A protein has these predicted regions:
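Acidic two-metal-ion nuclease catalytic site recognized across multiple nuclease folds
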Residues: 2-7, 12-19, 36-37, 46, ...
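Short helix-coil junctions and helix-kink-helix linkers
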Residues: 22-36
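Short, cationic-aromatic polyanion-contact patches
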Residues: 51-66
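Conserved non-catalytic scaffold segment of RNase H-like nuclease domains
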Residues: 59-61, 70-164, 169, 175-176, ...
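Short, glycine/acidic-enriched loop or turn micro-motifs at the edges of active sites
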Residues: 79-81, 184, 219
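Short alpha-helix plus adjacent loop in nuclease-associated cores
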Residues: 179-196
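Acidic, divalent-metal-coordinating active-site segment for phosphoryl/phosphodiester hydrolysis
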Residues: 213-225
Length: 262
């Protein structure tokens, strides 16, 4: 998957508005989007939220959306292995806006076999999945739930990459949603010797079970909300937040005054 192509495309839009013709050309040049009919409705269906202004220029909605107005979809999956050798067996997600949960999603996924070590870790057995919906049906339902919200996860590259690759294999096309990693964000706002989900749950006294998709998504949502409450005053928009989560210390110092840790 050419995730680097997609990231470069979105990063250019994050810098400034682009002419419609540029947007169409760059969109169509992405390998996985070669056979997608280009129009802004399809762009939104794939998860990217954009505006078209009177000058026929495209901009990311994240640049003009206040953090309190943004919808964040915090996601966690359980799988039988890596994206190359395994499959998703559970998806859990919770949507939050302005510090409040507004919706949740949870589904097991049918699989013929669950490795013993995965069953021991998650408590999910082959018997539990025998009558679960098939992966394409779950992915289709999840994508409708996700919409064009910001995709958030603890170690977002794994969950986002696995779901996007699975969607593409099932013929639904890759994800274009902007994404936010709560590990990266936590490193910039929380003083902790470790940044695993378990370590941050203990530090922040988050009382949820571990290693089930919805429970872990709820934990990550709590971490997200804690981090948002600690943001420096100059982080106003969703794009500010996304940029901040990936920023270096030097870049943060250049933005404004130093960030106070918890």
């Amino acid at each position: 998957m050419s995730q680097q192509q997609i990231d470069a495309f979105i990063n250019e839009l994050a810098k400034q508005s682009k002419p419609y013709a540029w947007f169409e050309r760059e969109f169509s040049a992405i390998d996985e989007l070669e056979f997608v009919d280009f129009d802004l409705d399809n762009v939104k269906l794939l998860g990217l939220s954009v505006n078209l202004n009177a000058k026929n220029e495209i901009s990311l909605k994240s640049k003009s959306t206040k953090i309190k107005d943004e919808i964040f979809c915090v996601v966690d999956i359980e799988s039988t292995g890596s994206v190359r050798s395994g499959q998703i067996i559970e998806i859990g997600a919770v949507k939050v806006q302005n510090g409040k949960e507004i919706a949740r999603f949870e589904s097991l996924v049918r699989a013929s076999e669950v490795p013993e070590n995965i069953s021991e870790l998650t408590g999910i057995t082959s018997k539990m999945l025998a009558n679960a919906p098939h992966l394409p049906a779950v992915l289709n339902e999840f994508r409708l739930f996700l919409g064009d919200s910001i995709f958030v996860a603890h170690n977002v590259g794994f969950d986002y990459g696995f779901i996007s690759a699975s969607l593409d294999k099932c013929g639904f096309g890759v994800l274009l949603n902007q994404r936010l990693c709560t590990i990266n964000l936590s490193r910039r706002l929380i003083a902790s010797p470790k940044y695993s989900l378990a370590a941050l749950k203990e530090l922040l006294d988050i009382q949820t079970p571990h290693h089930r998709a919805l429970a872990d998504a709820l934990s990550a949502a709590n971490i997200l909300q804690h981090c948002i409450s600690k943001l420096p005053f100059y982080i106003k928009s969703t794009q500010d937040l996304l940029n901040f989560s990936k920023s270096t210390l030097k870049e943060r110092k250049a933005m404004s005054e130093p960030v106070l840790l918890r």
